[in-house]
Amino acid sequence: MTQAEHMARIIEPGTPMQKVIPPRLVEPYLAGRRSVIAGYVYRTMDCAFRGPADFYRVLNLGYEGSDFTAELAEIYVMRWRAMDMDASLAPPLADGAAGLARPSVPEFYTLPIPVPVGAEIHRIVPGSEEFIARYDGQSWLRPSRGR
């Protein structure tokens, strides 16, 4: 790994991170029935995409058994600020997610960690995104209850 590649893989505390949430897990998160983040995560700065199709294509979300399809009208992401990611990151697979070609953005695989206080869920549609809720450490607060 070159020095530039190594630097591209560093996650400093406070780095904005995000995880694409499979459609079947959005409601369990919002209802408080799911309280961990695990799997492939990305730095938010590496994922300035225009809509669900870009997420699907660039992040290789069409792996075998995936809930994602190229035709999704919306996609949900969870965003949070990294804390000590060294303790939760596992080495990336040599060939990318589920054996597909590596995404064109750095990907990180996190072992299960609790959803951090202040994490947010956003809904992304082509050309725009909508804030859905923020985690206060006990529940997800939606805009009508204060942001």
Q: At which residue positions do the language-model features occur?
A:
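Catalytic toxin/effector domains delivered as secreted proteins or via bacterial secretion systems
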Residues: 1-147
